[in-house]
């Protein structure tokens, strides 16, 4: 019991020694405050890293006690929000600190984004202020102006980027494989692989059908396969798992023609059927349907590769003869419930630019006349202008206005009056003080 208290006190003393130290310049950031002053602060992620280094990753916890929205203003589609948050930081021994934080967002276009940023900034501010209560190493030294005036003179070099210190996915896989290997070796030695002995090959004299039918082979119990470790299973994997499990074309052809042979008599595999292949020097290329018959007539082509222009797929239903070009039969139209003449159908679906007459007027027998543009009248045709009367000019009487007479204005002295200033006489017009 005494040893536990001593160890706990030693741990507390170590934590207290770390908390008494002040922050280095690499942990301190600056921002513009009110006016021209610069405010020193510590970022939230740096404060969390310091807490993990001092207390341990499982030596402290944070709890959001409350979040309050103080105000929310909307003006011209932009939102301004202010939030207050209370956060408590508790250590593993029950010691806790609690403080308040504030977060604001101004002129945000999205309402949800404004709430998110305001609440997060309020919680982060409250967390930093709660951690500040534990000591200088967690941000309490930033309120010492004498310390801030001296820390600005301390120079430091930013740490170099260490690629070997990155957490990679390959590291996790290596740890898992190493743990599996240690577990397998700790359980005991792996069982050795033993291949079941094959039965001796029968002699030619013993391979007779009478003996095979008369003496059936005794049924042997299935051999139990030894359990192998996961490493043995990994050794058995090969490249065959990378290919498709579908049967090849040759296997599909041989499935129907394969026959079951007697269990005791081995049957040789049937020879492959002969195939008609073109000569090795024949070029292979894609040609059009019109050039295919000429190419097939000049060179040998396998029957399976011949081009059939009249081939029709069985999976497609053909209702119209595709080999000829003809009008749709009237019987087919009547089956579909269309009793109109073919010309009426064509006039309904007029070409682009054709003006169709309204349905209540008589249609033009020739549907192409309406699509023709109207001829413009020639410019040099004589016109009859004898019936056109020229406009007559009407003279309006002239109006005479009397000339204005000069009116004498009173002789008033000119004065200056300034607009926007109080009435006061200029300095030159002021009365001289009495002597």
From Swiss-Prot:
Gene3D superfamilies with a match to the protein in the record:
DNA repair protein Rad52/59/22
Q: According to the UniProt record, which residues make up the DNA-binding region?
A: 128-132
Keyword Nucleus among UniProt keywords: yes
GO terms of biological process kind: DNA amplification; DNA recombinase assembly; double-strand break repair via break-induced replication; double-strand break repair via homologous recombination; double-strand break repair via single-strand annealing; meiotic joint molecule formation; mitochondrial DNA repair; mitotic recombination
Kindly indicate whether the keyword Cytoplasm belongs to this entry: no
Compartment(s): Nucleus
What the protein does comes down to: Involved in DNA double-strand break (DSB) repair and recombination. Promotes the annealing of complementary single-stranded DNA and by stimulation of the RAD51 recombinase.
Family per record = Belongs to the RAD52 family.
The organism of origin for this protein = Eremothecium gossypii (strain ATCC 10895 / CBS 109.51 / FGSC 9923 / NRRL Y-1056)
- Gene from which this protein is expressed: RAD52
One GO cellular component term: nuclear chromosome
**Pfam families recorded:** Rad52_Rad22
UniProt keywords (A-Z) are: DNA damage, DNA recombination, DNA repair, DNA-binding, Nucleus
Extent of Pro residues compositional bias: 265-281
Q: Which residues form the signal peptide?
A: none
Q: Where is the composition biased (Low complexity)?
A: 206-217, 361-375
Q: Where is the composition biased (Polar residues)?
A: 377-390
> Which GO MF terms does the UniProt record name?
DNA strand exchange activity; DNA/DNA annealing activity
Q: Which InterPro entries match?
A: DNA_recomb/repair_Rad52, Rad52_fam, Rad52_Rad59_Rad22, Rad52_Rad59_Rad22_sf
Quaternary structure? Part of a complex that includes RAD51, RAD52 and RAD59.
Q: What is the protein's name according to its record?
A: DNA repair and recombination protein RAD52
Q: Where is this region: Disordered?
A: 161-281, 349-435
């Amino acid at each position: 019991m005494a040893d536990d208290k001593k160890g706990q006190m030693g741990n507390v003393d170590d934590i207290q020694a770390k908390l008494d130290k002040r922050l280095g310049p690499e942990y301190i950031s600056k921002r513009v405050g009110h006016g021209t002053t610069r405010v020193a602060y510590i970022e939230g992620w740096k404060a969390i890293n310091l807490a993990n280094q001092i207390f341990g990753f499982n030596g402290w916890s944070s709890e959001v006690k409350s979040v309050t929205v103080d105000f929310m203003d909307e003006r011209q589609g932009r939102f301004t929000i202010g939030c207050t948050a209370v956060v408590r930081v508790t250590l593993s021994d029950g010691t806790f600190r609690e403080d308040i934080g504030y977060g604001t967002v101004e002129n945000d276009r999205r309402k949800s984004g404004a709430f998110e940023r305001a609440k997060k900034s309020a919680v982060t501010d409250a967390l930093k202020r709660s951690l500040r209560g534990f000591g200088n190493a967690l941000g309490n030294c930033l309120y010492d102006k004498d310390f801030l005036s001296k820390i600005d003179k301390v120079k430091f070099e930013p740490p170099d980027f260490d690629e070997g210190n990155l957490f990679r996915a390959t590291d996790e896989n290596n740890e898992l494989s190493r743990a599996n290997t240690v577990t397998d070796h700790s359980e005991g030695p792996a069982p050795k692989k033993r291949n079941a002995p094959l039965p001796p090959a029968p002699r030619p004299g013993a391979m007779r059908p009478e003996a095979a039918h008369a003496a059936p082979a005794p049924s042997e119990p299935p051999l139990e396969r030894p359990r192998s470790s996961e490493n043995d299973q990994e050794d058995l994997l090969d490249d065959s798992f990378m290919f498709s499990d579908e049967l090849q074309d040759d296997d599909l052809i041989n499935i129907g023609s394969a026959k079951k042979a007697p269990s005791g008599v081995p049957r040789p595999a049937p020879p492959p059927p002969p195939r008609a292949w073109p000569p090795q020097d024949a070029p292979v290329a894609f040609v059009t349907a019109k050039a295919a018959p000429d190419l097939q007539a000049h060179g040998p082509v396998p029957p399976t590769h011949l081009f059939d222009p009249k081939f029709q797929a069985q999976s497609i239903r053909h209702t119209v003869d595709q080999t000829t070009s003809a009008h749709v039969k009237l019987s087919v139209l009547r089956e579909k419930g269309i009793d109109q003449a073919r010309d009426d159908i064509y006039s309904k679906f007029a070409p682009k630019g054709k003006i169709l007459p309204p349905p209540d007027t008589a249609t033009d027998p020739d549907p192409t006349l309406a699509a023709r543009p109207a001829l413009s009248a020639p410019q040099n045709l004589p016109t009859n202008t004898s019936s056109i009367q020229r406009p007559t000019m009407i003279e309006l009487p002239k109006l005479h206005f009397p000339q204005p007479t000069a009116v004498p204005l009173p002789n008033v002295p000119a004065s200056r009056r300034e607009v926007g200033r109080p009435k006061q006489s200029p300095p030159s017009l002021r009365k001289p003080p009495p002597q």
